Amino acid sequence: KGSNYVRTMRDEIVSLISYAVGCMFGRYSLDVDGLAYAGGEWDAGKYKTVIPDRENIIPVCDDEYFSDDIVGKFVDFVCKVYGEDTLEENLRFVADALGGKGTSREVIRSYFLSDFYSDHLKTYQKRPIYWLFSSGKKNGFKALCYMHRYQPDLLARMRTDYVHEQQERYRTQLQILEDSMQSAAPSERVRLNKQIAKLKDQALEIQKYEEKIHHLADQMIEIDLDDGVKVNYAKFQDVLEKIK
């Protein structure tokens, strides 16, 4: 169409990450060409190299609260595709293309937390196939699911296995930080106070979110893929990231 846009290295890496997320959910498989699953009958035989997430719920956290969170799964994907020997080198390459400060895993975590979803919305013209459940700006709780694998019990499972679990992690972490305050030097206390304030904000945000999830989980909402993304997304608008 006469566009002079040249794809950047970041564009290429964003595409790779999108494909990796597709493999995590079973939309794509490294073992078959094209779409592996977009509704209908699930065929586990299509997945040998990367096994899709069983729950169709992948947490997106600002810290390593879950070993199977999206960063852990992405690292595993890079390892399976490109080999363990060059893993750190490849993660650094991904992080450098994305841009940002910190270790490669920190940069990748920051991307998933802040930019992945807006990139996904752009790619799919605001009709996302991966849905981001989000408690709000404090990042108290975030998790992705794949629309085509949605089941009516998804929210109930998310609430029990992930939201409650995250709340428990916050309680434990806060206790550890508050205990550390007792023996901390004045300079260290400033840092600890900051962390405590942040965690308290997140704990409050997730507490309110838990009530919203509970309300919807009890309804066991059905979706019809033929209705399209917009209609189905609207059913969960109170608990999903807003589409901008």
Label the predicted regions.
Residues 2-244:
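Terminal accessory regions of large proteins
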